[in-house]
């Protein structure tokens, strides 16, 4: 029988402190009962001897030092999962908010996940088709990969996320279907409604599991959202043998919540005030992508983050780049030119692309046309720099041809619109058509 503790030593923001507590575990769930009989949930976030610090999910309003009762539940936070989670909408802590009732759980899964034995991992191969030429051809998303999107303020990363959810599909019939887990952190009501409305209008909601943490929801819930989403993905992938694509936005909001949470605990800050363990915390999310031996399913991740002031050296994109396998970078200049999606292909990279394309996966000429497009577009940038110095009239005929190629590439290859869903064959054929204008 669990012990119940009466009274609190201290209340500090969303944290409460208890003393003389025996046998508490880090991340253990706590039930907090108010004087009026209502209950709230929390978890242990710090232990010093017999003193523990508990983060209260619903906040500490109306809690009193004398009359609050606290009970340690002896388990970490768990997510109820079953096949019924498909098509459902949850809040950031995994509670249903779509009015369709509770989930009848087949099992309860620890949201922190199970550590994957590195030896049991299978090397990611085969690709996920997004229907977006700049990604499918030049920064191909490989099944089991973690490939972030680096965006900036005012760029259409939300539209791009919706388009990927609408169009993404696996290239073969292995596994028992394809599902998408979508997690939004720190978004406004308008953006959350846009996501829900877009998925329903596109008719893809039955294959989507949504987790929505709004900007006015508790900070602690924001730190739980990606873990709940990844737990749902692992259940679908490893228990239901489905291929799962996890898209979560915005990782920067998550990291800012982590910074605020760390500050409230009085921890020593690191770069730009973020906690010193930011790297390992992000790794605990990103490294849950992959394929394991004996399972037909897979977990693929597309974390979306906004770079403050478009600074790629900011701690969040910087550390994300160390952990993940490439990045897709969005360009403010292309966006200003009316090009959608504004993917800047030169700094974009998929490190696993070489092993999931070509004969038997996409098409035998995929790597060749990708190399050609990269080389030609890189030369276009050199010619543009030269043009700014000597003017277009002084360029050689060959350089003028490269400028023409650059305009065609941006207007017809990169720019494809929100509703265009190109197959890999259409994308590769279009690439060959474009390079044919060059000698």
Predicted regions and their residues:
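The Walker A (P-loop) glycine that initiates the GxxxxGKT/S ATP-binding motif of P-loop NTPases
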Residues: 151-152
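Phosphate-binding/switch loop-helix module in NTP-utilizing enzymes
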Residues: 138, 221-258
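Acidic-enriched and Gly/Ser
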Residues: 1-4, 10-130
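Conserved P-loop
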Residues: 155-206
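Loop/turn-to-beta-strand initiation segments
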Residues: 146, 177-180, 206-209, 239-245, ...
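P-loop NTPase nucleotide-binding/switch module
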Residues: 68-70, 77, 84, 96-146, ...
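Conserved catalytic network of the ASCE P-loop NTPase/AAA+ motor domain
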Residues: 140-142, 168-176, 200-205, 235-240, ...
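Conserved catalytic/coupling modules of large nucleotide/cofactor-utilizing molecular machines
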Residues: 253, 260-439
